């Protein structure tokens, strides 16, 4: 009841017209759309079929299944479902077809049997089949042993929708009487699908509940004329066998629902043999479609080929259609998969189109048509016939959950299917498009019509409009404009043109000959006016707008009707380069009153959408500046040079030439320039009449690669006058430059095409610009020229480095490697910081820049030199340098304190140098190329944008310097770093980007005294000093230095002096014994301090 209530509410909003999404020849105008509705909750429209009754009268009907319709009086049930007949020429409701109006409650139940779940017509004058797949057979009613089996059954009706002969009636229930239970035939559900073969010979049933819902297909003879053809034994045929009942012969696993959808035809596998097509939408969890053939000997239906679905739970095979889309005589197969989904692509439902390759299906790759998300696109697929009469059948696809429901119309073509829908019908009643019927002309206009059902108890019939082709011709007199020939025709310029346009129509069928009212339209220079330019012509008495219209009547096919008018040329026109285009087009006029055909409003024809809407002719100007023979033989020549533009100024410089090809080194410039020079001079000065005439409509067409776009042009010089004009297309991929009309003899022009390089990428290696000169004058050697340039991308990367500190010291005692536990025990801290700057294009599309550091790990004898503790980065993603094991190789404990200075104060170092016993200074330079073993540390600079920095934290290995370099005054350690770019294109140019960092290492003073001078040297120096002092005293004594002077010699003579205060060095808070004596000072400055 909940479902019924819901459907009732849906019915209240149904009944409105479908809206047109994109239009072709299915008429969607309100008065031409036919609507039929059923009882609320009856599911009127669940199934549809078009039926052509020939006897006792010619009728074309729409049959509508309503599987939830109320029961007939004698069916002893509430809802049984039913079948309705709809006459589209009548405004009244559809009529219920009365059959199955009895019931035996002791042996059967028709409650919710869903009569009308499917309905099919055999064709003109043929039978009709409709089924109730939930029909129940009962046994032992009202007893404890009561059982029910859902066999399902079908009714066959004669063409007049009555039961008339032995083949008619409801005895089509082949599961009745067989083994029961769902493992066999107890849940047979015959009639979920049923159809007739197109040759009228067979009726085909699907029973998807058989054999634990494996499903089967059964084919039975349905043609009394077989006896007249001496065919006395033909079937029935069944998957698994009519008598064998061998479920192992079913070609799909359990729960596959084989027989859920059906179609058939010849020309699927063989041109002569019929093939049955059945869907199994749950086979292998995705669905399958099986091609079956008859086996005369065993009466089996055997599989010929199986199509497998590609999406999990996609219901591949929910509906199938056999149709020859390309009209090659081989039937193609269309398969719906309404629950196919693709989350990334927002796909909800799909239809697969398999184009037949002369009966060979193994290598056929299907064309997939996709629906929108959750639309159930493909729940119904139908062959709707050739609705536009172009010779290729068409299909319709339903998508009932796309908004309120949609039906997509796809046309066939010589190549198969046109994947873009030619028309989309949009419903205003919910679930529009659940069922579709077509391939029959209901309104007798020779074009098949379309019926669309919904789950909201409504059906909409769309009538097809006849498609006509209108042949259009234009003649203009005179066909060329001679500005020197003027006449008294009424035009201010004295030049007139007579324009005549004629029309005739053709259509299918050839007997379709109604008079058609059209509006003929003549227009001149339509595109020129759209671009905002004024027209050079106007029609007489039509004002300034060059447009003329006239109503015409085409009385029948291939009967011509014409219109004629005079066109005036405006005065003083400047544009004589371009011809004057004149177009003719038509519109079908709707008559004020429309006649009715078969009680239906007349459907107006529509123009073929595949035909050109307009026809055009161009009127050219007569050429001037030609030779005596009135033939212009021009001699256009072109030269080019590539250059670069300096900033935003109009200053250009030529590109360097490398191996004969200009080379563009692209850094940060945004534009390049192509200098073009065009001349028109005689090729042979001795015979100037040979060529070099005026080049009429001279034009240069420049076509640019995807990496370049047109920006502007600059005219440099021209002779004898400037008349250059360049216009680019919308995306800047082509520029048309008008050189002049005419580009006269001995003319020349030089100009720049400025091109933007914003689309040049690191993959761009060449620039090819196609240059083509055009003129309406005679010149045979105007071959296109390709301007070529090589592109080199120069990366503006630089690296700089600094060491902190740049001077360090070593000293103390030697500590073995095994004894070290933390980095503080290694030696002085040195931090190397490298800054990388990118001033050019981002590297995101190029690859990864890598900083290569030649790390001085150890000296030549294998002893440690610099111990690398840690690598950190700024402005980069998390960095991982290789080889990773070279970083903190010994796994020492990291110190987070500030670095511990091992060096002495600077002043002490200076004094130690002053008192050095050896004036010759010893030093050494350590670098990778001479005396140090280095490791290449590679650090990818991922995420590098404009700048980044890398910090390498290291320790000087103190013990190595104590053991190896304590005798030296100092050492220099050189560390080199450079950048390279991996995965770079061949045209990447990376200038040398490297740096060198120097660190100076000094020994402390104690180390220098202890290790630099032996004790015996000190002893000898002391003894030598004493000896020299004794010798000096002896010499002074010999010279009388120690004798007392006489009185007169001792008269004092005074000289004022000041003695500087003695400078005493303080060490360890004690006075040093050796005091340095200062020289006498005889002059001083008052600003100085003396004692």
Curated annotation (Swiss-Prot):
GO terms for biological process: brown fat cell differentiation; cell adhesion mediated by integrin; cell-matrix adhesion; filopodium assembly; integrin-mediated signaling pathway; leukocyte migration; lymphoid lineage cell migration; odontogenesis of dentin-containing tooth. Residues 1-23 form the signal peptide. Disruption phenotype: Mice expressing a null mutation of the alpha-6 subunit gene die soon after birth and develop severe blistering. The blisters are due to separation of the basal epithelial cells from a normally formed basement membrane. GO terms for molecular function: insulin-like growth factor I binding; integrin binding; metal ion binding; neuregulin binding. Residues 24-1011 are extracellular. Isoforms containing segment A, but not segment B, are the major targets for PMA-induced phosphorylation. Phosphorylation occurs on 'Ser-1064' of isoform alpha-6X1A. Phosphorylation is not required for the induction of integrin alpha-6A/beta-1 high affinity but may reduce the affinity for ligand. Undergoes PLAU-mediated cleavage at residues Arg-595-596-Arg in a time-dependent manner to produce processed integrin alpha-6 (alpha6p). Pfam families: FG-GAP, Integrin_A_Ig_1, Integrin_A_Ig_2, Integrin_A_Ig_3. Its main location: membrane. Keywords: Calcium, Cell adhesion, Cell membrane, Cleavage on pair of basic residues, Disulfide bond, Glycoprotein, Integrin, Lipoprotein, Membrane, Metal-binding, Palmitate, Phosphoprotein, Receptor, Repeat, Signal, Transmembrane, Transmembrane helix. InterPro entries: FG-GAP, Int_alpha_beta-p, Integrin_alpha, Integrin_alpha_C_CS, Integrin_alpha_Ig-like_1, Integrin_alpha_Ig-like_2, Integrin_alpha_Ig-like_3, Integrin_alpha_N. It comes from the Eukaryota. The keyword Ribosomal protein does not apply. One of its GO terms (cellular component) is basal part of cell. Glycans are attached at residues 78, 223, 284, 370, 731, 746, 927, 958. It is found in: Cell membrane. Disulfide bonds join 86-94, 131-154, 175-188, 489-496, 502-562, 626-632, 726-737, 881-928, 934-939. A lipid is attached at residue 1039 (S-palmitoyl cysteine). Ca(2+) 1 binds at residues 324, 326, 328, 332. Integrin alpha-6/beta-1 (ITGA6:ITGB1) is a receptor for laminin on platelets. Integrin alpha-6/beta-1 (ITGA6:ITGB1) is present in oocytes and is involved in sperm-egg fusion. Integrin alpha-6/beta-4 (ITGA6:ITGB4) is a receptor for laminin in epithelial cells and it plays a critical structural role in the hemidesmosome. ITGA6:ITGB4 binds to NRG1 (via EGF domain) and this binding is essential for NRG1-ERBB signaling. ITGA6:ITGB4 binds to IGF1 and this binding is essential for IGF1 signaling. ITGA6:ITGB4 binds to IGF2 and this binding is essential for IGF2 signaling. Heterodimer of an alpha and a beta subunit. The alpha subunit is composed of a heavy and a light chain linked by a disulfide bond. Alpha-6 associates with either beta-1 (ITGB1) or beta-4 (ITGB4) to form ITGA6:ITGB1 and ITGA6:ITGB4, respectively. ITGA6:ITGB1 is found in a complex with CD9; interaction takes place in oocytes and is involved in sperm-egg fusion. ITGA6:ITGB4 is found in a ternary complex with NRG1 and ERBB3. ITGA6:ITGB4 is found in a ternary complex with IGF1 and IGF1R. ITGA6:ITGB4 interacts with IGF2. Interacts with ADAM9. Interacts with RAB21. Interacts with MDK. This is Integrin alpha-6. The gene is Itga6.
């Amino acid at each position: 009841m909940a479902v019924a209530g819901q459907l009732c509410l849906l019915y209240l909003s149904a009944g409105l017209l479908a809206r047109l999404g994109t239009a072709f020849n299915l008429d969607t105008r309100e008065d031409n759309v036919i609507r039929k509705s059923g009882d609320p909750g009856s599911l009127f429209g669940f199934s549809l079929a078009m039926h052509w009754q020939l006897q006792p009268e010619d009728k074309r009907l729409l049959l509508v299944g309503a599987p939830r319709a109320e029961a007939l009086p004698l069916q002893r049930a509430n809802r049984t479902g039913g079948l309705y007949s709809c006459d589209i020429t009548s405004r009244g409701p559809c009529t219920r077809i009365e059959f199955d109006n009895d019931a035996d409650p002791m042996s059967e139940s028709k409650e919710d049997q869903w009569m009308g779940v499917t309905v099919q017509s055999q064709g003109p004058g043929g039978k009709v089949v409709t089924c109730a797949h939930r029909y129940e057979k009962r046994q032992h009613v009202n007893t404890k042993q009561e059982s029910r089996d859902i066999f399902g059954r079908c009714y066959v009706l004669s063409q007049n929708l009555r039961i008339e002969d032995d083949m008619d009636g409801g005895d089509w229930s082949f599961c009745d009487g067989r083994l029961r239970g769902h493992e066999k035939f107890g849940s047979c559900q015959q009639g979920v699908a049923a159809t007739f073969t197109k040759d009228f010979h067979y009726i085909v049933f699907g029973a998807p509940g058989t054999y634990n819902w494996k499903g089967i297909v059964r084919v039975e003879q349905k043609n009394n004329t077989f006896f007249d053809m001496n065919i006395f034994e033909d079937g029935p045929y069944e998957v698994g066998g009519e008598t064998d009942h061998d479920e192992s012969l079913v070609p799909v696993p359990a729960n596959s629902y084989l027989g859920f959808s059906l179609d058939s035809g010849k020309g699927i596998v063989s041109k002569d043999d019929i093939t049955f097509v059945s869907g199994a939408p749950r086979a292998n969890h995705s669905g399958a479609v099986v091609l079956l053939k008859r086996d005369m000997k065993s009466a089996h239906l055997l599989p010929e080929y199986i199509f497998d679905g590609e999406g999990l739970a996609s219901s591949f095979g929910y509906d199938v259609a056999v149709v020859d889309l390309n009209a090659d005589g081989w039937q193609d197969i269309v398969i719906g998969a309404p629950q196919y989904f693709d989350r990334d692509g927002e796909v909800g439902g799909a239809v697969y189109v398999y184009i037949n390759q002369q009966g060979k299906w193994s290598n056929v790759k299907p064309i997939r048509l996709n629906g929108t998300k959750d639309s159930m696109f493909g729940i119904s697929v139908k062959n709707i016939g050739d609705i536009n009469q172009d010779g290729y059948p068409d299909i319709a696809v339903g998508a009932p959950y796309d908004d309120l429901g949609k039906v997509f119309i796809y046309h066939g073509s010589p190549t198969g299917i046109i994947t873009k829908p030619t028309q989309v019908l949009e419903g205003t009643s919910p679930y529009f498009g659940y069922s579709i019927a077509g391939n029959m002309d209901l309104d007798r206009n020779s074009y098949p019509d379309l019926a669309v059902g919904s789950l909201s108890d409504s059906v909409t019939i769309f009538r097809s409009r006849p498609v006509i082709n209108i042949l259009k011709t234009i003649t203009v007199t005179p066909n060329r404009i001679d500005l020197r020939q003027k006449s008294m025709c009424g035009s201010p310029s004295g030049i007139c043109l007579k324009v005549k346009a004629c029309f005739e129509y053709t259509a299918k069928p050839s007997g379709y000959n109604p008079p058609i009212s059209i509006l003929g339209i003549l227009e001149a220079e339509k595109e020129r006016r759209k671009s905002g330019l004024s027209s050079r012509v106007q029609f007489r008495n039509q004002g300034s707008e060059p447009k003329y219209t006239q109503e015409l009547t085409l009385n029948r096919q291939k009967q011509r009707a014409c219109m004629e008018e005079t066109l005036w040329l405006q005065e003083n026109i400047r544009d004589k380069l371009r011809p004057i285009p004149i177009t003719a087009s038509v519109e079908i006029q709707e008559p004020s009153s429309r006649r009715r055909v078969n009680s239906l409003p007349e459907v107006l024809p529509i123009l073929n959408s595949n035909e050109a809407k307009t026809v055009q002719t161009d009127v050219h100007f007569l050429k001037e500046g030609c030779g005596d023979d009135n033939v212009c033989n021009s001699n256009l020549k072109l030269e080019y040079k590539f250059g670069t533009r300096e900033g935003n100024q109009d200053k250009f410089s030529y590109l360097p030439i490398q191996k004969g090809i200009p080379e563009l080194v692209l850094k940060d410039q945004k534009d390049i320039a192509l200098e073009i020079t065009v001349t028109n001079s005689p090729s042979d000065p001795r015979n100037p009449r040979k060529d070099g005439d005026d080049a009429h409509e001279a034009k240069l067409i420049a076509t640019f690669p995807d990496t370049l776009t047109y920006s502007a042009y600059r005219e440099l010089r021209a002779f004898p006058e400037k008349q250059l004009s360049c216009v680019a297309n919308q995306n800047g991929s082509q520029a048309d430059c008008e050189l002049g009309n005419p580009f006269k003899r001995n003319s020349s022009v030089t100009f720049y095409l400025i091109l933007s390089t914003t689309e040049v990428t690191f993959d761009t290696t060449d620039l090819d610009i196609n240059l083509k000169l055009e003129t309406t004058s005679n010149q045979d050697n105007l071959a296109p020229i390709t301007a070529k340039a090589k592109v080199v991308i120069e990366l503006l990367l630089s690296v700089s480095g600094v060491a902190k500190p740049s001077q360090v010291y070593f000293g103390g005692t030697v500590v073995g490697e095994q004894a070290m536990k933390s980095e503080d025990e290694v030696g002085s801290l040195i931090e190397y910081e490298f800054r990388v700057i990118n001033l050019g294009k981002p590297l995101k599309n190029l690859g990864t820049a890598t900083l290569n550091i030649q790390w001085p790990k150890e000296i030549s004898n294998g002893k440690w030199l610099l111990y690398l503790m840690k690598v950190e980065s700024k402005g980069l993603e998390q960095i991982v340098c290789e080889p990773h094991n070279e970083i903190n190789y010994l796994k020492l404990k990291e110190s987070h304190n500030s670095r511990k200075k091992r060096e002495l104060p600077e002043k002490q170092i200076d004094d130690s140098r002053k008192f050095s016993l050896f004036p010759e200074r010893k030093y050494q330079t350590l670098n990778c190329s001479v005396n140090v073993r280095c490791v290449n540390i590679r650090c990818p600079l991922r995420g590098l944008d404009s700048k980044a920095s890398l910090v390498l934290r290291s320790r000087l290995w103190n013990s190595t310097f104590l053991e190896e370099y304590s005798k030296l005054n100092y050492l220099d350690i050189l560390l080199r770093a450079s950048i390279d770019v991996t995965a770079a294109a061949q045209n990447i140019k990376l200038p040398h980007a490297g740096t060198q960092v120097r660190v100076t290492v000094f020994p402390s003073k104690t180390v220098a005294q202890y290790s630099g001078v032996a004790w015996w040297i000190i002893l000898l120096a002391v003894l030598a000093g004493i000896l020299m002092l004794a010798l000096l005293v002896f010499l002074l004594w010999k010279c009388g230095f120690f004798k007392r002077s006489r009185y007169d010699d001792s008269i004092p003579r005074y000289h004022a002096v000041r003695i500087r205060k003695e400078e005493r060095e303080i060490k360890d808070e004690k006075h040093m014994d050796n005091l340095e004596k200062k020289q006498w000072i005889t002059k001083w400055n008052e600003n100085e301090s003396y004692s």
